[in-house]
């Protein structure tokens, strides 16, 4: 088999480059799984202001440290819930923030967020045009489907993806449910993951048996089962 034939040449490659050479070949890869926020679509600072806007919509007092409290409760919710539900999340905010937050709070909040996207990125569109001509592309994101689909459409990249998998339909990453669905109809060695969060995207994919591309400019971790890229556009060099 090709693995045995390549083993003789292993001295010419570092261990990382060897794994990458073997798994990065377009003769093997058939599907690419993408994370969404901070991977395909940059995170805007204005998104934080949408919390205050939602408080104001419901006439809920917004105190000086409100966002930090809200953010911590959101982290706790994500930590303790494998699957997301808007009404359940709204109640979790109400019970843990201690204010009269209605059951439709998250509906309104995510509605604001879904309309807030950066200007279209022509370079990203060019990359996705190239990748979608060679591979099946899928999004796997730990958030709500209606918001993420809206963002993909507004950003002008929805058409490039065959599936949008979200954590209101499947247990969130790094659990295996979303990876299982994303790999349906493919062998694991035919699928790679691209993401910016080590725990949910990269380690989750590795634990499931996938090779990954880790989008980061600050994390110095390296490994045999993932390749670090500093820009999403770097994928064109490898896939």
Region spans (language model):
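Asp-based, Mg2+/Mn2+-dependent phosphohydrolase catalytic module
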Residues: 2-13, 18-32, 125, 129, ...
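Active-site neighborhood of HAD-like aspartate-dependent phosphohydrolases
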Residues: 21-69
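Conserved strand-to-helix beginnings and helix N-cap segments that scaffold or border functional pockets
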Residues: 44-47, 121, 151, 176
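An amphipathic alpha-helix signature
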Residues: 47-55, 86-91, 145
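A metal-dependent, Asp-based hydrolase signature
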Residues: 60-61, 75-109
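Surface-exposed cleft-lining segments at the edges of enzyme active sites
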Residues: 110-117
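Structured helix-beta-strand junction loops
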Residues: 133-134
């Amino acid at each position: 088999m090709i693995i045995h034939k390549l083993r003789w040449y292993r001295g010419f490659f570092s261990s990382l480059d060897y794994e990458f050479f073997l798994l990065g070949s377009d003769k093997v890869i058939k599907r690419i799984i993408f994370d969404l926020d901070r991977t395909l679509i940059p995170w805007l600072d204005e998104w934080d202001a949408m919390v205050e806007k939602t408080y104001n919509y419901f006439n809920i007092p917004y105190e000086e440290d409100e966002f930090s409290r809200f953010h911590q409760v959101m982290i706790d919710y994500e930590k303790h819930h494998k699957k997301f539900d808007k009404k359940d999340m709204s109640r979790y905010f109400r019970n843990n923030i201690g204010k009269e937050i209605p059951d439709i709070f998250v509906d309104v909040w995510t509605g604001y967020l879904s309309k807030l996207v950066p200007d279209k990125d022509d370079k990203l569109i060019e990359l996705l045009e190239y990748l979608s001509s060679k591979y099946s592309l899928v999004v796997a994101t730990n958030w709500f489907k209606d918001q993420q689909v809206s963002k993909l459409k507004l950003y002008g990249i929805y058409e490039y993806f065959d599936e949008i998998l979200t954590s209101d339909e499947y247990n969130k990453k790094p659990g295996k449910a979303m990876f299982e669905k994303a790999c349906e109809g493919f062998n694991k060695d035919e699928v790679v993951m691209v993401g910016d969060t080590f725990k949910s995207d990269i380690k989750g994919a590795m634990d499931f048996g996938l090779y990954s591309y880790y989008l980061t400019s600050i994390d110095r971790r390296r490994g045999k089962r993932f390749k670090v890229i500093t820009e999403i556009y770097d994928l064109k060099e490898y896939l």
